[in-house]
Amino acid sequence: HEQTLKDVQKDFQDSILPGLEDFVRIDNLSPEFDPEWETNGKAEKAGNHLINWALKQGVKGMKAELVKEKGRTHLVFIEIDANGSNKTVLLYGHFDKQPPLGEWDEGLAPTKPVVKDGKLYGRGASDDGYALFAIVESIKVIQLQGGKHGKIVITIESGEESGSPDLVYYLKSLSGRIGTPDVMFCMDSGCIDYSAVWLTTSLRGVVNVECEVECLKESVHSGSGSGIAPDSFTVLRILLDRLDDSKTSKIVAPLSVDIPDYRVADAKKLAEYQKEK
C-alpha cells in the first residue's frame, strides 16, 4: 500500500495536476451559457484533451472517442475491456463548466490554474473536471496491483450544467456497447471536507409539475367577483397540500420512504465526525 500511495502521488504531480491545469485553461462553457458552443470548438478541444490524457496513462484494453451528433452536445466515451470478471461498471462525469464571475480573489481567475496551499483553483477543476482523472487513475492502480475488474464504461458529458439535454439520448444510442451495468458511479457530488474521500449514498429527489388552474371562462373585476368566484391560488394550495401538508410538512405516503436503520447510524457517525473536526 505504501508503494501504491507513492505511485499515485507521483502520478498526481507528474500527470494528473498538469492535465487538470490544462483543462482549466479551456473556457468551454455549458451550452446554456455559450450560444456558439457548437461552432467555436471549445467543447471539442476540452473533450479531446481529456481523451488524449486518458490514452497516455497506460491503461490496458482502453478505447476512447469523442461522440458528437449534429445539434447534440459532445460525449467522451471510453470502454475498458474486462479482466477476470463478467460484471459491467458504468462511470459518469461531465466536463462542461458554469460561466465565471470574474476574479473572485486576488491572483485567481477562471481560466488561470493556481495551486495555493496544496489546492488547485480554476473553473471546472472540481465541478467536474476531476472526474475522468480520478476514474482513470483508479483503474490504472487496480491493473498495476494485478487486480481484476469487469468491463468498464466511462461517459463524460458536456451538457450537465444545462440540464443534460442529450445524456439519455446517448445512453440509449450507445446501449449496445454499454450493456447492462451492474453498478454505476456518479463522479459529481459534494464533500464535507478535503481530508478524506467522500461517498454520497443518496440525494433528495425533485419532481417538476406544470399545473394550470382555471376557475372562470372569462375575467371578472375583483371588486365584484372576489368571494364569489373561487381563487385560483387557493385551489392550487389545496392541491399541493394533498402532496405536501403545509401545516405539518409531511408528504403523502407514496412519495415517502422509510429510512433504513444503517443510514440513521451513518448520519450519527457523520455528526460525530464533524463534531470532532
Which residues does each PLM region occupy?
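N-terminal helical capping/dimerization or prosegment-like subdomains
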Residues: H1-E103
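Histidine/acidic-residue-rich, glycine-tolerant segments that coordinate divalent metal ions
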Residues: H149-P230
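Acidic-enriched catalytic cores of C-N bond-cleaving enzymes acting on peptides and small amides
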Residues: R177, I192, T201, S222-K277
